[in-house]
Amino acid sequence: DYTLYQSGLFSTYAYLPYFDSKEMPVRAIAVSKDEKLIGSRNGLFYIDEKKQRFKSFKVPELRSNMILCIYAFEGKYYIGTYGGGIYILNPSTLTLSDFETADLKSTPFLKGHVFCIKSDDEGSLWMATSMGLYCYRDGKQIRHYTTENSKLPGENVYDICFDSTRKGWICTENGLCIWDPSTNSLKSDMFPEGFIHKDKIRTVYEDSNHELYFLPDKGAIFISDLSMNHFRRMQSGTPLDGKDAMFIIEDHEGWLWIGTNLGLYRYDKKGNFIPYNFVDGLPSSIFITCFPVIDEEGTMWFGNSKGMIYLTSEQNGRKAKWHYPVAITDVLVNGKQSVYAKMS
């Protein structure tokens, strides 16, 4: 008999006896000083440990149990679902409401898919949906981009990422386009030859060096400067080869954390990778598309296919110091002691 050793570097979040994320596929998280909001394929969960409040939301209270995104905006949480549109959670009353807008039934906000919700620096709220890209300000729709009325490459919009120059990178099922704030329009003719704009991109991330990381649905990560004058694929021959990147985030030491469909890695941008696995406390090597959060105390929170896991700032990026040698005590072949074992 044996027990696999785990260092406890990562921990799986629980708020017992009310909630345990163990074995839960976590797709969206929001973490503030006191509140945690966790979205999964099994509904939505709100936790406030300081005030000892907990509430779960599932069908039939929700139109869909599959939560795709959570975004904190003006004191409330906006929740995007797969097939159930948008909900707004008021954390003071722990009540849900629909997103109020004119012609609600003709939008995806009741029964459509809402993949991403973000705000820009002007306070506008953008929604990436199965019916194009929406923009709202002060509760009123000011834009709705579709493939018919704009340069949007596809109706299914998966993500929108605003960079430090205020440009918005729009990720669709058929490739990229750019929201140009100087002209208030979408553009698809700004990309140089050899760029990744025709691929299906999961998300775009800007690091502290103002480099953009494009995570394609399949293939190697693509890296570019903001002006798209210099770009490249991530070098081959790394632990990421053959894996699909699901998310990327930079920590306080300037390293990148990259979650894939087969493992979690910390990368120093110079060719050095640190892999993490079951021994480090990961419940599963399979990560799904869930953008991580770094809270005020420096703790990192990740969505995993088997729970919401976290890494405190004291443990950030460090492997356990203790190494345990493997010792073979017996060898069995088809349930019987082998000749080697008898000789030893």
Residue ranges and their predicted role:
Residues 44-48, 120-122, 163, 177-179, ...:
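Short beta-strand segments and strand-loop junctions that repeat across beta-rich extracellular domains
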